[in-house]
């Protein structure tokens, strides 16, 4: 199944949006793209939000119809991740699994913290730099549990099935074998990346350990089941998430006409980023 993107506005502006299209029609990045590309073999569709080594904090918006990817803001200003030495921007292709939801109404029994109200995050570790709105087919290798400001924020470690090393990577121990140091660097980056913005160091459940593939698959299924309750209108509190979709006629928020209401593509050249975003931050004890 092939997906394309529809860009509106210039990257690095408040107007920037990327919709995902199927057969030229916008679909919801949150609800319409199937979680499973191949359920029998546990191959998942991943929606790429942030390409590796970039700084703009892009995410699937929860509040807008068909959930385009936009740049996050704080107090009306665009958000960028700072460069924490020796890293530059995000250290992986960063995105999410569609049709998943980390339920903020439920506390996880092992992390003792509620979900973060987002689709589950995915860190794709392959060699190719992805692009915003790309739908990759990946396999899950393991999972980490970030505790972000009191919420459980799962991070699935995955690899594009077309990556040259994908056949050799089948569980979390293979990551350390073929990508030595990557899991340690991932743990470090998530611990420190908010410090330059004046926030405390993040914490991890399980002492920062990356759990194995089986554990990851169980968590992915849990978040998929939570999404099923959400899209069916059965969640105790949907937290204002826009549930409009164009492919799920049995749901109360199905609207085939929603695609036609989306503006046509109007891409513009990337807007310049303030030079201050290039700064490197040196954090004690981070290397």
Swiss-Prot record:
GO terms for cellular component: cytoplasm; nucleus. There is a cross-link at residues 239, 279 (Glycyl lysine isopeptide (Lys-Gly) (interchain with G-Cter in ubiquitin)). Gene3D superfamilies: Inorganic pyrophosphatase. Mg(2+) 1 binds at residues 116, 121, 153. Belongs to the PPase family. One of its GO terms (molecular function) is magnesium ion binding. Its cofactor is Mg(2+). It is an enzyme of class 3 (hydrolase). It comes from the Eukaryota. It catalyses: diphosphate + H2O = 2 phosphate + H(+). This is Inorganic pyrophosphatase. It is found in: Cytoplasm. PANTHER family: INORGANIC PYROPHOSPHATASE. Its EC number is 3.6.1.1. The lineage of its organism: Eukaryota, Fungi, Dikarya, Ascomycota, Saccharomycotina. It comes from Saccharomyces cerevisiae (strain ATCC 204508 / S288c) (Baker's yeast). Present with 68400 molecules/cell in log phase SD medium.
């Amino acid at each position: 199944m092939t997906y394309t993107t529809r860009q509106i506005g210039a990257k690095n502006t408040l107007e920037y949006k990327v919709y995902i299209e199927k057969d030229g029609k916008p679909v919801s990045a949150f609800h319409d793209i199937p979680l499973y590309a191949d359920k029998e073999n546990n191959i998942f569709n991943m929606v790429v939000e942030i390409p590796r080594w970039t700084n703009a904090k892009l995410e699937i918006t929860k509040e807008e119809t068909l959930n385009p990817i936009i740049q996050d803001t704080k107090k009306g200003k665009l958000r960028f991740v700072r460069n924490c030495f020796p890293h530059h921007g995000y250290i992986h292709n960063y995105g999410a699994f569609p049709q998943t939801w980390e339920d903020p109404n439920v506390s996880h029994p092992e992390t003792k913290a509620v979900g973060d109200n987002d689709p589950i995050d995915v860190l794709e570790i392959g060699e190719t730099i992805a692009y915003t709105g790309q739908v990759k087919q990946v396999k899950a290798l393991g999972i980490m549990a970030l505790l972000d400001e009191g919420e459980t924020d799962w991070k699935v470690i995955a690899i594009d099935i077309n990556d040259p090393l994908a056949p050799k990577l089948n569980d979390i121990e293979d990551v350390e074998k073929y990508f030595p140091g990557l899991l340690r660097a991932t743990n470090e980056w998530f611990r420190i990346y908010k410090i330059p913005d004046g926030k405390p160091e993040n914490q991890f459940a399980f002492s920062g350990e990356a759990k194995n593939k089986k554990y990851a698959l169980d968590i992915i299924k849990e978040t998929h089941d939570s999404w099923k309750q959400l899209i069916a209108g059965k969640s105790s509190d949907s937290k204002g998430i826009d549930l409009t979709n164009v492919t799920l006629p049995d749901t109360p928020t199905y609207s085939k006409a929603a695609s036609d209401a989306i503006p046509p593509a109007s891409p513009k050249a990337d807007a310049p980023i303030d030079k201050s975003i290039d700064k490197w931050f040196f954090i004690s004890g981070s290397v």
